[in-house]
């Protein structure tokens, strides 16, 4: 009976570690792009990713930022729904990967199909992303190594790879026996390394670990850690829910204000325009006399059609305005979403430049659309010029959506019972993430009782719990229990 109870306990613990906790929203909604991929790198750039069922994603080089987002989870919102992915790799080939204007997520086909329609398009240009916790219920794991010549010693060199962390880690400090100061570890792609700067590393030693949300943990190593095996570090980052974000449900990203102004805005194409004798989006015959506009010689029932891959949301669009002139006055000109013209616009379009403003609601829009068309709704041909095509937003539109900003929230949750006590924070005069990412040189941090902060921190000691794979323990437990009962 005692053996059965022990095995049942083991089974419960295995199941518990498999269950994901609820995710916590950690940022405002940002504007990004997503593309699908059929294959993923079997050896991703991030060395610390242990996704445990969370789909992995790549990021463009600028957003990846030397690996500062390795292991960070993001909730992505497209026209068909949401999915959560974890950053594991970087892409550096092609314009989408080398641009530095916005986040570009490369996600598995099956995840893209949850949020978009891969059979219709290969990009989502109005993707919304939000930083979230990864929802791990177990503890952070660490794999320690020493120098390659002597991997079990740490006197001059120490490397540690953290995994299973709820949020990405932005800074790691270490303080050895008799050291007066903390020294920083250099982070790259999820691997944190310390090289001897002024003191040899002797134990006990303490690691001071800070997440991207500002939560801090001190981990004391009473003796040399076991190398090359995952160790349960007996702590987990638990970012506190932020009241202003709790009800912040992200929809698709807000459209750029202009569809066309001296050129098409990012994500818009006019290649599906139809029934025309001549078409250019670089005409110099503009209203202002400078820049460019669109000029199309439309046949009867021809149209200038602007499409956006991955669709777009109309909820925050109030009005559509544009400058137009035609070769002849016409009362048979329509503007419409989708594929069917509903009614002609008012006022009459004329042979002189006119600014037209239309209510988006009057265009009989759906919540999500994929195109908007300027249509010659008659049998006779007409020559048209279009310029300055833009949206006016509703009052509640999220106008401040970040694109490439570091938008992690400086989250400082209170220490909860059972997780340790508040620790003093080393002076953070340099190092960590600051605009350009993590510095390549070690920095020295003073530890002064006069400069203590009320930064949240928790203590954990190195009991050196070596981890067996969760699934292995789980199936062994099931097998033994089936034999016993």
Curated annotation (Swiss-Prot):
The alphabetized UniProt keywords are: Disulfide bond, Glycoprotein, Membrane, Signal, Transmembrane, Transmembrane helix
Q: Where is this region: Disordered?
A: 408-436
Q: Does the keyword Transferase apply?
A: no
Signal peptide coordinates? 1-21
Topology within the bilayer? Single-pass type I membrane protein
Q: Could you name the domain of life of the organism this protein comes from?
A: Eukaryota
State which ranges are Extracellular (membrane side): 22-464
Query: Would you list which residues are glycosylated?
Result: 117, 365, 454
- Principal location listed in the UniProt entry: membrane
Q: What is the role of this chain? A: May serve to lubricate the movement of the cellulose microfibrils during cell growth and wall extension and/or may serve to maintain the fluid state of the slug cell wall.
Family membership: Belongs to the expansin family. Expansin A subfamily.
Designated name of the protein: Expansin-like protein 8
* Organism listed in the record: Dictyostelium discoideum (Social amoeba)
Q: Which gene encodes it?
A: expl8
């Amino acid at each position: 009976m005692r053996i059965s109870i022990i095995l049942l306990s083991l089974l419960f613990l295995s199941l518990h570690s498999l269950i994901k906790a609820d995710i916590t929203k950690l940022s405002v909604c940002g504007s990004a792009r997503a593309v699908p991929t059929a294959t993923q790198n079997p050896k991703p750039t991030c060395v610390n990713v242990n996704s445990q069922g969370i789909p992995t994603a790549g990021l463009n080089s600028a957003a990846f930022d030397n690996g500062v987002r390795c292991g960070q989870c993001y909730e992505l919102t497209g026209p068909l729904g949401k999915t959560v992915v974890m950053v594991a790799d970087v892409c550096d080939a092609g314009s989408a990967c080398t641009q530095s204007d916005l986040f570009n997520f490369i996600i598995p086909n099956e995840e893209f199909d949850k949020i978009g329609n891969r059979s219709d398009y290969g990009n989502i240009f109005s993707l919304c992303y939000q930083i979230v916790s990864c929802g791990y219920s177990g503890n952070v794991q660490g794999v320690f190594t020493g120098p390659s010549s002597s991997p079990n010693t740490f006197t001059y060199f120490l490397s540690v790879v953290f995994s299973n962390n709820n949020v990405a880690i932005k800074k790691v400090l270490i303080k050895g026996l008799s050291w007066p100061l903390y020294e920083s570890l250099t982070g790259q792609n999820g691997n944190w390394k310390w090289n001897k700067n002024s003191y040899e590393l002797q134990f006990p030693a303490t690691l001071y670990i800070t997440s991207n949300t500002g939560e801090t943990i001190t981990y004391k190593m009473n003796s040399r850690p076991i190398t090359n095996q995952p160790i349960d570090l007996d702590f987990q980052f638990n970012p506190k829910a932020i009241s202003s974000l709790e009800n912040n449900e992200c929809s698709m990203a807000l459209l750029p204000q202009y569809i066309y102004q001296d050129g098409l805005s990012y994500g818009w194409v006019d290649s599906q325009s139809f029934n025309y004798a001549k078409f250019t989006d670089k005409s110099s015959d503009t209203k202002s006399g400078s820049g460019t506009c669109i000029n199309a010689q439309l046949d009867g029932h021809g149209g200038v059609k602007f499409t956006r891959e991955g669709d777009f949301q109309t909820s925050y669009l109030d009005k559509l305005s544009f400058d137009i002139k035609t070769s002849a006055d016409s009362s048979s000109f329509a503007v419409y979403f989708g594929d069917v013209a509903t009614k002609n616009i008012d006022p009459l379009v004329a042979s002189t430049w006119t600014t037209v403003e239309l209510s988006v609601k009057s265009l009989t829009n759906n919540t999500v659309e994929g195109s908007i068309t300027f249509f010659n709704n008659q049998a006779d041909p007409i020559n048209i010029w279009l310029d300055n095509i833009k949206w006016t937003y509703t009052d509640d539109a999220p106008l401040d959506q970040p694109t490439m900003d570091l938008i992690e929230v400086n989250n400082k949750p209170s220490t909860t019972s059972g997780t340790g006590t508040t620790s003093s924070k080393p002076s953070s005069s340099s190092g960590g993430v600051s605009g350009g990412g993590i510095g390549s040189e070690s920095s020295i941090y003073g530890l002064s009782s006069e400069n203590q902060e009320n930064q949240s921190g928790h203590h954990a000691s190195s009991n050196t719990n070596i981890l067996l794979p969760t699934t292995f323990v789980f199936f062994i437990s099931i097998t033994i229990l089936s034999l016993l009962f």
